[in-house]
Amino acid sequence: MALISMRQMLDHAAEFGYGVPAFNVNNLEQMRAIMEAADKTDSPVIVQASAGARKYAGAPFLRHLILAAIEEFPHIPVVMHQDHGTSPDVCQRSIQLGFSSVMMDGSLREDGKTPADYDYNVRVTQQTVAFAHACGVSVEGELGCLGSLETGMAGEEDGVGAEGVLDHSQLLTDPEEAADFVKKTKVDALAIAIGTSHGAYKFTKPPTGDTLSIQRIKEIHARIPDTHLVMHGSSSVPQDWLAIINEYGGEIKETYGVPVEEIVEGIKYGVRKVNIDTDLRLASTGAIRRFLAQNPSEFDPRKYFSKTVEAMRDICIARYEAFGTAGNASKIKPISLEGMFQRYARGELDPKVN
């Protein structure tokens, strides 16, 4: 089975200049859509369990769902990633369950809501890196808080995210601080704040350089060229699915996401992991609303759930192709987690800081 570390996958992405969409998984339909799209496009996969998904489905159920996907598609390299761990303990339990990558979100306190100070973030991330790398498991850290540069409001989803109004110093990751953070923690990947936020309501109008700072990505990448950058809250909020939802009884107000072309620009400057959740939610909801409206006598869940798989699969295919992920699964030769531990121990994977 091709369960690999995120570090190996993102190193390959950096070498060949592509990005990898990281899709949140809550149920069978999402998992199947992601894997069928990856199979069709020969794409490596990052699937992640958010705090909300772990609460909804339970970490053991998610683990076996992902392992089942790996068993059915053994030729596709898969990273099983725990998203937004709020403490080293959460990350440690995920590693015990078999996750090959964890995120220690020390930008927030353990309640997942209160912005943490820098020293706290460094300390808990260092702790997580120490035991994770000893297991060959990758670690993603976070510096800065997700939120809107347009309004200053923090972004929350699935119970994780700062609350209230934040200033620009919290909403934009500082390049110098990023370099210091990576040097001290040795994280494999760093989620940075550039003006994106969780959920569907990211921007009230198509984003500009004032509300989405691709320039900040370039500045951070120049300081930590070997550290893989992560864009959270990067759903593009497809307008066609918004229209379908509202056509069939939905009431979602006007909103815009992160344009795919802006993500592609970020990939040129070190973005290797792109977190996507809302796009699949919108496609799934739109497909169900449309099917039930057109088939009011239907009550077999398999029939309308199959429509969600089709809708989400198309989104996944589009992202794999746009980010350059397509065609790379077969090029990755899996390294075991034990092999990754040996590489960490030899210092081969220590970060470069300019």
UniProtKB/Swiss-Prot annotation:
Zn(2+) 1 binds at residues 84, 198, 232. D-glyceraldehyde 3-phosphate binds at residue 50. It comes from the Bacteria. Pathway: Carbohydrate degradation; glycolysis; D-glyceraldehyde 3-phosphate and glycerone phosphate from D-glucose: step 4/4. PROSITE patterns: ALDOLASE_CLASS_II_1, ALDOLASE_CLASS_II_2. Binds 2 Zn(2+) ions per subunit. One is catalytic and the other provides a structural contribution. Its EC number is 4.1.2.13. Keywords: Glycolysis, Lyase, Metal-binding, Zinc. It is an enzyme of class 4 (lyase). One of its GO terms (molecular function) is zinc ion binding. One of its GO terms (biological process) is glycolytic process. It holds the Pfam family F_bP_aldolase. The active site is at residue 83. Its cofactor is Zn(2+). InterPro entries: Aldolase_TIM (IPR013785), Class_II_FBP_aldolase (IPR050246), FBA_II (IPR000771), Fruct_bisP_Calv (IPR006412). Dihydroxyacetone phosphate binds at residues 199, 233-235, 275-278. Zn(2+) 2 binds at residues 105, 142. It catalyses: beta-D-fructose 1,6-bisphosphate = D-glyceraldehyde 3-phosphate + dihydroxyacetone phosphate. Belongs to the class II fructose-bisphosphate aldolase family. Catalyzes the aldol condensation of dihydroxyacetone phosphate (DHAP or glycerone-phosphate) with glyceraldehyde 3-phosphate (G3P) to form fructose 1,6-bisphosphate (FBP) in gluconeogenesis and the reverse reaction in glycolysis. NCBIfam families: cbbA (TIGR00167), FruBisAldo_II_B (TIGR01521). This is Fructose-bisphosphate aldolase.
